[in-house]
Amino acid sequence: GYAPNMELPLWEHMDAVRHGNAAYYAYGSWFDPGCSNKIFEFKRFGGKLLLGPWRHMEVYRGCDFPQSEFDWKADHLAFFDRYLKNAPSDIDQMPPVRYYTVGDEDPWHFAADFPLDSQTNPQLRLTASGGIVDRAAEPGTITYKVRNDITVFDSMGRLNRRLEKDMNAENEKCVLFTSDPLPGDLELTGFPVAELYATSTYKDGIFMALLEEVTPDGVSRAITDGMLRGRSARLGRNPAYDALGLPYHSSMKRDDVQLSPDKPTLLAFHLETISRIVKAGSRLRLAVYCGGNGFNQPEGMPEDVTVTFHFGGSSDALLRLPVIAPNVTKFEGDGETVYAFKRAVYRHRDNCWKEYPCQQVFPAADGLHFVTKDFTAVRSTKGDLVT
């Protein structure tokens, strides 16, 4: 048969695609394993990016999340009419990113770039006592025997990453880290990153992490997941990953590493991207495991393998979260909607869009100034009111 990525590898033509003036539009679904790749493509090629609350292929048939329906036919036609027919259109004047936040009362949002302007990246420490804390962790270890009887995904595997079952039964088979209850609602939009330090009785293995929300009634449900093979742990460089602040692994044989039984290896990897509101009173949980149904262990790996996770000091295990700080970007009034971002200001009036690229953005006594060639917009805050 034909193996596209091996016989015609895209990466050999990246620059030609990027600089070939082709119009690019990436559709992504938060619960499809390919969603993260859409963001990497957007960072590499530009164009437009849509991120919705769907599973694999659900963009074309919808799902049961509120306001999740999307008129993809009209969207496709508008895009192709503009770039193939050169028909009059304001599609290239719109904010390039549109995304859906699960759990938000008004779930659809625009953005001028990804990561979002207001993304922060707090570094939380994982502790040997099973905590997720915002302070330095004491040195310690957790020893874990690899097991393969963990079932996270259903029969669709990672093609269905919308996991709604209570994970507590499977969590008993994992290494768990749990935070204190959240004092307020928390928006996560972007890529979480786990940094683990491990030694192992075998030279290779698979390491998986599941970020979960534990509700006040004790139910634990998955938010997103990520994984890394031990031999691929060596960090490299990639423009798209660099632009997102993510660890990158080439997975090339020349970069192979071997896990050591006595010297901890850094296992830094991203979890799949997501946009979600975690409610006040819930706790965050990271479940770490090294095998399970639907996953094959490395060839030659013995059945009895023990992994030791290390914490504190030079083995500072971390969980970095894409927390979105409160930030008003949408303003409505007088028949017009204005969106203000660091990259550009967008005006929407009479069903027409107009983009005004920002020459500079800076804070002043009267608010945040967005300076364009045509005007300066000022975002002011007085108490709870933002104008």
Task: Enumerate the language-model features and the residues they cover.
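Active-site-proximal cap/loop segments of hydrolase catalytic domains
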Residues: 1-92
